[in-house]
Amino acid sequence: MHRTFLFSKIHHCTLTETNLEYVGSISIDQTLLDAAGIVPYEQVQVVNMNNGERLVTYAIPAPADSGAVELNGAAARLGTRGDRVIIMTYAQLTSEEIEGFEPRVVLVDQENRVIEDAPVVNASTPELCLT
């Protein structure tokens, strides 16, 4: 039996742009994709912290170190520049894979740069809440 678990998360990104006329997806700075282990065209869930909207789309790379996080296509209607979002991927794990598994959590600053010295957030630190 497989169970679905959070695989990776980019926490508190800031939307830098929306592009209604683009075919679809969310463009994400390649540096953030690499840090989170997200590959191009992988399914992602995006949660908008400003308006509560949730959507499922796929990730495409934006230039590395650009800080770009852009909602494209119809998804552009669900956010505006400056909104804070959480980007998540999930994985199907077997019972054997579950033990010891921890998702990859990437914390970013307001310019969507990885916070290198951020504390590790996992099940053993539920009291940690970043603003």
Curated annotation (Swiss-Prot):
Enzyme superclass (EC): lyase
Lyase found in the keyword field: yes
GO CC, alphabetical: cytosol
List of residues binding substrate: 57, 73-75
Co-factor binding details: Binds 1 pyruvoyl group covalently per subunit.
InterPro entries documented for this protein: Asp_de-COase-like_dom_sf, Asp_decarbox
Keyword Zinc-finger assigned: no
Subcellular location: Cytoplasm
UniProt GO BP: alanine biosynthetic process; pantothenate biosynthetic process
Family, similarity comment: Belongs to the PanD family.
Protein name per the record: Aspartate 1-decarboxylase
Species of provenance: Acaryochloris marina (strain MBIC 11017)
Gene field: panD
